[in-house]
Amino acid sequence: MRYNGKKFLKKELLPFFWCSGCGNGIVMGCIVRAMEESGFSKENTVVVTGIGCWGKADDYLTTHAFHGTHGRALTIATGIKLANPSLEVIALVGDGDGATIGGNHLIHAARRNIDITVIMSNNFTYGMTGGQYSGTTPFGAISSTSRYGHVEDEFDISELVKTAGAAYVAKGTVANPLQLQRFISKAFKKQNGFRFIEAINICPTHYGRANQLGKAPEMIESLRKSSISIKLAKNMKPDELAGKIVIGEYVDKKVDGYIRRYKEVQKRAAK
C-alpha cells in the first residue's frame, strides 16, 4: 500500500520556507508518509522542534506541536511523554540544535531510553544563522567560522547514540528516501525505548557553496556515491572508510523503556 501523508500537512502553507535545493522537504515527506503508515493520528501526536532551519518543520504539520528553545527539544519532549504517555511524541532536531547545543540532552535521553522518536536532520552546518560549523561538520570543511578548514573531528552521532544505550538507531540519507522512510516507520512502530534516526541532508546554500560541492542534484549524487551499508563497512579498514557515510540500522534491541520502568516505581511507591 502506498501512503502520501497529506493529512499531516498544512497544504495552505506550502511551499516550504526552506531554500531552493534544501533536503528538508524530502525528510518531511518521509516523516508524514511514515506517520500515516504507522497509523498515527494528528490528535494523538505531538511534534517538538527546536531552533534552526529544521525547527520550522512544525509550522507545516497538522499535529500538535511545541516549538522550543535552542538545544532543548528533547527536554520538552521528555516532559510531554512523562505527563501523557499515551501520546506519540516526535522530536525534530538539527545537528546544531540536537547534537551540538543540545548534545548532552541527546546522550541522556538515549541513556534513559525515553519512549520518544528523534529525527535529526544532519546537514553538517548551522544553516539559519549563516553556515557556522557544528558538532558534525567534518574535519577540514569550510564554514563561516572555519574559513581555512575545520580543525576539529566530527561526531558520528549514530554511533554516539547507539553507545549511549538507545533501543533503535538508524542512519539514512536524502539520496535514498524510500530507505529513510522505512527506518522512520520502524522507529514509529517500535513502542518502547529511545528511537533515533539520523537523516543525512544537504545544504546547498551554505555548506555546499562554501565547500564547492555544486548544486542540489550534484550534492545528492555525491551522497549516493559515498554511502555504504553497515554490512560492507564492517569489512573495511579505517582509511577505506574515510569520507564514507555508513548507512543502515546501527542497533535494534528490545528494552523496557523509561515509561514502563517509571510506572513500576509508581506502583511500589503507592503501596
Which residues does each predicted region cover?
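Flexible, low-complexity linker and terminal segments
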Residues: M1-Y3, L14, I202-K271
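Active-site diphosphate/adenylate-binding microenvironment
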Residues: Y3-T69
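Short coil/turn connectors at secondary-structure junctions
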Residues: L14, S41-T45, A83-V89, R111-I116, ...
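Glycine-rich beta-alpha junction loops
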Residues: I51-C53, N123-T125, N176, I200-H206, ...
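Thiamine diphosphate
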Residues: I51-G127
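Short, hinge-like loop/turn segments at secondary-structure boundaries
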Residues: H64-A65, A109, S134-P138, A187-F188, ...
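Conserved thiamine diphosphate
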Residues: S134-K186, K190
